[in-house]
Amino acid sequence: MSRRRVVQKRPVPPDSRYNSRLVSMMVRRIMRHGKKSVAHNIVYDALATIEERTGSDPLELFEKAVRNATPLVEVKARRVGGATYQVPMEVRSERGTTLALRWLIHFSRTRSGRSMASRLASELMDAANETGSAVRKREETHRMAEANKAFAHYRY
């Protein structure tokens, strides 16, 4: 780690259509090879699909999906005297949101379906209903932390 001064976190500006920082974060995570307009189209199409299928506010459902996929604890590897322990650590809110978005996008990409927008919409709706791969990943992370509770005193 650098011993110089700490780098200031740059604020994420809210997106233009929904005025939401979360949507903006999602767009930035979906973007590949600097093609932000393509990422915008994917996210906006997914939210439009959600509105079409459910008839409710897509932003509300999106926020609920992210909340349901956000982990509260995770395990980190810590080496102590030749042995590596999986130490459970609490997740800060910002990291939790980042992990949730990462998992939602990852499992959207691995889903079967035609377009990325439809796959993302399906994954978001599943996460909002507390099903789907991203929520399962969160529960798996919580189970790992629970199983390794004995090593919690190695926290750093």
UniProtKB/Swiss-Prot annotation:
PROSITE patterns: RIBOSOMAL_S7 (PS00052)
GO cellular component assignments: small ribosomal subunit
Domain of life from the UniProt record: Bacteria
A single GO molecular function term of this UniProt record: structural constituent of ribosome
Cited Pfam families: Ribosomal_S7 (PF00177)
UniProt xrefs under InterPro entries: Ribosomal_uS7, Ribosomal_uS7_bac/org-type, Ribosomal_uS7_CS, Ribosomal_uS7_dom, Ribosomal_uS7_dom_sf
CDD domains, A to Z: uS7_Chloroplast
A biological process from GO: translation
Keyword terms of this UniProt record: Ribonucleoprotein, Ribosomal protein, RNA-binding, rRNA-binding, tRNA-binding
Assembly mode: Part of the 30S ribosomal subunit. Contacts proteins S9 and S11.
Function: One of the primary rRNA binding proteins, it binds directly to 16S rRNA where it nucleates assembly of the head domain of the 30S subunit. Is located at the subunit interface close to the decoding center, probably blocks exit of the E-site tRNA.
NCBIfam families (UniProt xref): rpsG_bact (TIGR01029)
Family assignment from sequence similarity: Belongs to the universal ribosomal protein uS7 family.
Protein name per Swiss-Prot or TrEMBL: Small ribosomal subunit protein uS7
Record lineage: Bacteria, Bacillati, Cyanobacteriota, Cyanophyceae, Oscillatoriophycideae
Gene designation per UniProt: rpsG
